[in-house]
């Protein structure tokens, strides 16, 4: 499950003249002790995106997880693309969170870079779950148009691929339109990406999930050395 999303991203990254970055074998593919859970990771870089990572967790019929985060280079003030998609097989429930995660919360910045998410939400009513917004800090690294779905098998089969494709294509089109930085310079962009990693290191809900499957030692290393690598940077 979700292999089609991985392939879709790889195709788009390839079209950006991106290349795969070699990562530690313990992150590339890792099994828990009884091999019921397998995690696979990919890391890419391109002229436009300094880091684009993909994670797939295979828990068989019980759980499937897909995550991707794209960091623009430090010359671009664009938001960070973030997507978390989870399928709970036992309860037949889909949870998806898709957002252009803003570096700042200034209204004009949000309107310029994030508001087009609203158009996508209008097309897919099941992915407009405002009831769950309170679990995310809207004053930090989430946009007012964050796409949230708490759906079912129908949403998984019928809607997910289409909305994910629209979500990624729209984001790439924003970059292709070559917007001029209006709000942040390169140093401020770097600082805000560092702050994003520090915030995510503290708040990411996947921490507990990974610890329960793969143990605390591996999870701590994985979060620091793969997921949020700027977490240890010092802001001057």
Curated annotation (Swiss-Prot):
Entry EC number(s): 1.3.7.2
Keyword Oxidoreductase: yes
Keywords annotated in UniProt: Oxidoreductase
Broad EC category: oxidoreductase
Keyword Oxidoreductase in annotation: yes
UniProt record, GO biological process: phytochromobilin biosynthetic process
Reaction(s) catalysed by this chain's protein: 15,16-dihydrobiliverdin + oxidized 2[4Fe-4S]-[ferredoxin] = biliverdin IXalpha + reduced 2[4Fe-4S]-[ferredoxin] + 2 H(+)
Pfam families: Fe_bilin_red
A molecular function (GO) term: cobalt ion binding
Origin: domain of life: Bacteria
InterPro entries: DiHydbiliverdin_OxRdtase, Ferredoxin-dep_bilin_Rdtase
Protein task: Catalyzes the two-electron reduction of biliverdin IX-alpha at the C15 methine bridge.
Family, per entry: Belongs to the HY2 family.
Protein known as: 15,16-dihydrobiliverdin:ferredoxin oxidoreductase
Organism (species): Prochlorococcus marinus (strain AS9601)
Upper lineage: Bacteria, Bacillati, Cyanobacteriota, Cyanophyceae, Synechococcales
């Amino acid at each position: 499950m979700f292999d089609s999303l991985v392939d879709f991203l790889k195709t788009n990254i390839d079209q950006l003249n991106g290349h795969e970055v070699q990562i530690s074998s313990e992150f590339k593919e890792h099994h828990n002790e009884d091999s019921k859970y397998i995690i696979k990771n990919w890391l890419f870089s391109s002229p436009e995106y300094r880091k684009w990572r993909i994670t797939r967790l295979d828990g068989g019929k019980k759980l499937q997880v897909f995550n991707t985060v794209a960091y623009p280079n430090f010359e671009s003030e664009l938001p960070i693309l973030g997507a978390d998609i989870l399928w709970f097989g036992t309860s037949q429930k889909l949870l998806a969170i898709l957002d252009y995660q803003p570096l700042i919360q200034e209204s004009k910045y949000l309107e310029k870079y994030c508001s087009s998410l609203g158009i996508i939400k209008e097309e897919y009513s099941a992915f407009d779950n405002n009831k769950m917004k309170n679990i995310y800090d809207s004053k930090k690294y989430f946009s007012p148009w964050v796409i949230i779905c708490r759906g079912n098998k129908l949403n998984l089969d019928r809607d997910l691929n289409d909305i994910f494709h629209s979500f990624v294509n729209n984001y790439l089109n924003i970059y292709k339109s070559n917007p001029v930085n209006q709000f942040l310079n390169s140093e401020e962009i770097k600082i805000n990406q560092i702050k994003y990693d520090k915030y995510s290191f503290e708040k990411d809900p996947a921490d507990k999930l990974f610890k329960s499957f793969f143990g605390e030692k591996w999870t701590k290393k994985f979060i620091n050395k793969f997921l949020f690598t700027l977490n240890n940077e010092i802001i001057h």
